[in-house]
A protein has these predicted regions:
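Short alpha-helical basic/polar micro-motif
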Residues: 66-67, 154, 257, 261, ...
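Short amphipathic alpha-helical interface segments enriched in basic and hydrophobic/aromatic residues
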Residues: 49, 70-74, 261-265
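Helix N-cap and loop-to-helix transition residues
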Residues: 33, 54, 108-111, 126, ...
Length: 379
């Protein structure tokens, strides 16, 4: 299927078609904690199990993710101006036989030359030289308060068998964004170092800028299944309000469940034999208002009935929604299955807002269906 035919795509559709060739894409922007890092690692472990990766691959990916996440948590205490967003971000993507692990955080400009020197040194060495260099650093005992003298960089290069890809983008005279990416090949290839495609890192840099502009915290593009829903809920927990606002967290969790199940149960796509349905979920927040957006493929012949169902929900007031809810349940019981309409009603009742939706036509058979809902702390 050609996903490039729509000449005026929405943001989520444009992002979906760019990421569609990945079998896994997880993007998080915000504050990092040990608990959140553990959840990200757990998510990766679950997905690697689903891909039936070898034990060797899982160990390599896990180690590099752990080092990248530790680097973020160690350095996210850099002091910034109020106007400067100091959020860090983390990305893991699987493309054909490779995992791409990318991290980003703010760094003080005065530390760039030292870090560049370490990265350049590591990239200049072959496998045996890296081993000797690791021993040399250990013998010298050059450890800093931040947790090392480049040992993690050396080990990531050794375990991945690839060069370290990196970039710095100046924010102001004191701070810069540091971007770091490493590739792990699957299945394992012959030892040797291959240059990573810098265009992939450049794309991530541009994506991070868009994510910041649109106040997004989480993007999850994967095959949606009941199992993946558990991972999604686990990862969104750190992005929703504070721990005391249980009502808000529960409300958003329930809406995420409905939106995700809408993809899993009602998305259309060419027969592939896989269990899940491809789709994308985004979560953003600005001034206490959360925006949840999902997108997936549907058949064009379903657009009219789906639009009618959504319009009926949007036009109903909240008293009418109760009646519509009961009526829809009875209709679903007659048909012997739950339709998407019941989920739409539930989403509006919980969010107290109408649902925004849009269709991006792809070809004669399929369109990309996106749906968005806003939830406020004040509601």
């Amino acid at each position: 299927m050609n996903l490039q035919e729509n000449k005026n795509p929405s943001f989520i559709f444009d992002l979906y078609r760019q990421m569609n060739h990945y079998s896994l894409s997880y993007i998080y922007r915000g504050g990092f904690s040990i608990d959140l890092s553990n959840k990200i690692l757990s998510l990766a472990e679950t997905n690697m199990e689903n891909f039936s990766e070898s034990s060797s691959t899982k160990k390599k990916v896990y180690f590099i993710m752990l080092e990248s996440l530790q680097n973020i948590t160690r350095h996210q205490d850099v002091k910034t101006q109020e106007s400067t967003d100091n959020s860090s971000f983390f990305v893991i993507q699987r493309l054909e036989n490779d995992y791409y692990i990318t991290s980003g955080n703010i760094i003080e400009n005065k530390n760039i030359d030292s870090l560049k020197s370490k990265l350049s040194k590591v990239n200049s060495l072959d496998k045996e030289s890296l081993k000797e260099y690791y021993k040399e650093i250990l013998a010298q005992g050059e450890l800093s308060k931040k947790g090392g003298a480049g040992l993690g960089l050396i080990e990531m290069a050794r375990k991945s068998g690839n060069k370290l890809s990196y970039d710095f983008k100046e924010i102001d005279t004191e701070l810069s964004n540091f971007y770091f990416q490493i590739k792990v090949s699957v299945p394992e290839v012959e030892p040797g170092f291959k240059d990573i495609n810098i265009d992939r890192l450049t794309w991530i840099e541009g994506l991070e800028k868009l994510i910041l502009e649109k106040n997004l915290n989480l993007i999850y593009q994967v095959d949606f299944t009941q199992e993946s829903l558990i991972s999604i809920l686990s990862m969104t927990e750190g992005n929703i309000g504070n721990k005391q606002d249980l009502a808000l967290r529960k409300k958003i969790f329930n809406i995420i469940v409905e939106l995700s199940q809408n993809i899993y149960k009602h998305a259309d796509e060419p027969e592939t034999g896989k269990e899940g349905k491809s789709g994308i979920l985004m979560l953003g927040e600005k001034n206490g208002e959360y925006t949840l957006t999902t997108g997936n493929l549907i058949l064009n012949k379903r657009i009219e009935s789906l639009s009618a169902s959504l319009d009926k929900v949007n036009e109903a007031n909240f008293e009418e929604l109760d009646t519509l809810f009961d009526k829809t349940i009875m209709e679903d019981e007659k048909k012997g299955q739950k339709g998407a309409g019941l989920g739409f009603i539930d989403i509006k009742m919980k969010s107290r807002n109408n649902l925004t939706y849009h269709f991006n036509q792809i070809d004669a058979d399929y369109s990309f269906f996106e749906i968005q809902v806003k939830v406020s702390e004040k509601q």
